[in-house]
A protein has these predicted regions:
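Eukaryotic intrinsically disordered, low-complexity regulatory linkers and tails enriched in Ser/Thr/Pro
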Residues: 1-99, 103-173
Length: 173
């Protein structure tokens, strides 16, 4: 039995927690974090299945085929709303810390092996991850969102152009 997923585009990040009962929590601006009994990737998978009829494995396969990113790549949930989550693995946990690109502002080094992630509304989170790795993940997320948006726009332009001239599109033969 499926329940409505708790994740939505307003999520700032999904962070693993050290708790007896919960594995992670979804952090939103202006409201209390929502703890979950599931790992971070299971929350994302549940959202993709419920709203988009796909799963995390399919999105990763597409990422590998279309963008040549093989591991730890950003997941485009919905490019129209710019809902993109990118992972930051921490050395202490295999349960990745996921950041919503829409709410991300910047990251700064915060000591040895630590990075501070700044969100656009003033919230900050400190993670046990290398600063250069965080920057690389951010750049990947921007590149993937940019390409997927351009691919969608180009496809729409191609179809519109053929409809204008009353020509059937050549891919339906």
């Amino acid at each position: 039995m499926f329940t409505t997923p708790s994740l939505n585009p307003g999520v700032c990040c999904i962070e693993p927690v050290r708790h007896v009962e919960f594995l992670c929590q979804a952090v939103y601006h202006g409201r209390a974090p929502e703890p979950s009994h599931k790992p971070t990737e299971a929350l994302i998978d549940e959202l993709l299945i419920y709203y988009y009829g796909t799963n995390l494995a399919a999105r990763r396969a597409h990422l590998k085929a279309a963008h040549a990113i093989h591991r730890m790549g950003p997941i485009v949930i919905d490019e129209r709303m710019q809902f993109v989550l990118f992972p930051i693995t921490t050395s202490r946990s295999r349960n990745p810390f996921w950041v919503n690109l829409h709410h991300f502002l910047m990251c700064t080094p915060a000591g040895e092996g630590m990075t501070e992630i700044h969100f656009n509304h003033g919230m900050m989170k400190r993670v046990a991850a290398d600063y250069n790795f965080c920057e690389k993940q951010y750049e990947k997320a921007l590149r993937v969102l940019d390409r997927s948006t351009k691919i969608r726009e180009q496809s729409a332009l191609y179809i519109t152009r053929h409809q204008k001239h009353d020509q059937p599109a050549p891919f339906g033969r």
